[in-house]
Amino acid sequence: MTTQKNIAPLYWGGLFIGILLSLIYAQHQWVMADQLQMLEKGYLGARAGIWLNYGNVASAMGNVPGSLSAWLVGVPLLLWDSPYSPMLLLLALRLLAFVLLDRVVRELFSPTVRLAFMLFFWLSPWFLYDSLLYNPAYLPLFAALHFWSAFQLREKGAFWSSFVCSALHVLAIGMAMQLHYSWPLLAVISGYLFLMGRIRFNWFGILAGVALVGLSLWPYLHETMINSSISREANPDAQARYIGWGLVHVYPIFKALIYWLRYSSWIFTTKLVNGVEFSAFAAVPWLHWLLIALWKVVIYAVGAASLWLVILANRYGWTQVRASLWRRRREQAETPRTWFALYGAAAVMSVIVCAALAPIVFSYWHLTLVFPFALFPLLLWLEHWSLGREHKVRRYLLWAACYCIAVNLVAAHDSRKFAYGYDYAGQVNLYLQQHPVLKLHPASQE
């Protein structure tokens, strides 16, 4: 049997490589509109003392409520006035997301599956491709906090433990709300778990969490009273959309479910796949064309094979939950691993519900909150399949890790959002020079 000691070098090596890849992505990001919105809010707060009470402009819904995005960028700048300070905080929060998820995976699964989770989550190009300063990049932390707190609340515990976990559960939803309008994904999961008796809240903790979220949103609510434009989309086409638009048009639901399968496969976002141009070889046309062709053939061939495994895994996951999905917990015994599988099933339901209600067609970043949960069926299937095959599985995982590292290195240096010629700090400093209001005030230099 594989022990924790056997996988320790591979585990810590993978963790370290993931950190290095995150730093490479961060350094070579192309600073565009979403990052500039975050930076503007942070620098206004840190340098001008103006803390905006609303977040980034969202698709068809106006600005995201709350000032969390300003604080996430501005507070690190107060501690260290460098473009790298908010970026380092972001990467640290993403590492914390992995740690929270890993604590539960370590408790429920074998060391081999834990190693697989590190690969599928921490080294996945789906995850690392978001190592840039924009609001969806923070969402894995709140997804992880939501899942971790729910796992702690599956049984009735001590008062203070359940109080803290209940408050954190609400805060996970409330803080996600202040970064992206995809927060209902978490709310639907919580609703299912509560209605089916699979989560036992401490109501004092719930009230405390609601109070904290309410206090953090109060300045935004006051702002909407005097500036209603921040709560609605100015684009007439977007205004024509309505709640339930996805259900009427059906395709948005289908596309969202495809993303659920793609997240745990290696059919990566087209921004990564089709954005790679191997521009360093543009001077040699035949080699340039050959590299692009080989890249796409390999990516789509490996992606198709991985998608087949993902479909098998989701089918296996369905067999684990179909008898329990609509039965309240008190009607039957339930193991922690069954609870884990049901949480994943709840995530699928949340994708369907939110895609049906949303006034837009989801892109991959709209569903970032469920990316970790899309891996759950794969972990369940791998735990079943790897019995007696641990050494073979570890060899497969090593090859898979090499593949993911190679894809990440290419994407971090030559894709639609990243390129070896981009310098993150240089772009930010140029932006600051072009916007005098964000320049360092003399008083803050003393």
Task: For each feature predicted by the language model, list its residue ranges.
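Membrane-interface transmembrane helices that cradle and orient dolichyl/undecaprenyl
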Residues: T2, E107-T112, A144-L168, A176, ...
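Extracytosolic helix-loop segments that constitute the early lumenal/periplasmic catalytic or substrate-binding loops
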Residues: G18-L21, Q37-W71, V75, L79, ...
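Signature aromatic-anchored transmembrane alpha helix within multi-pass, membrane-resident enzymes
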Residues: L382-D414
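Hydrophobic/aromatic-rich transmembrane helices and adjacent perimembrane loops
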Residues: Y129, L139, L185, T338-R389
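Membrane-interface alpha helices of multi-pass inner-membrane proteins
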Residues: S161-H180, S190-L193, A211-L215
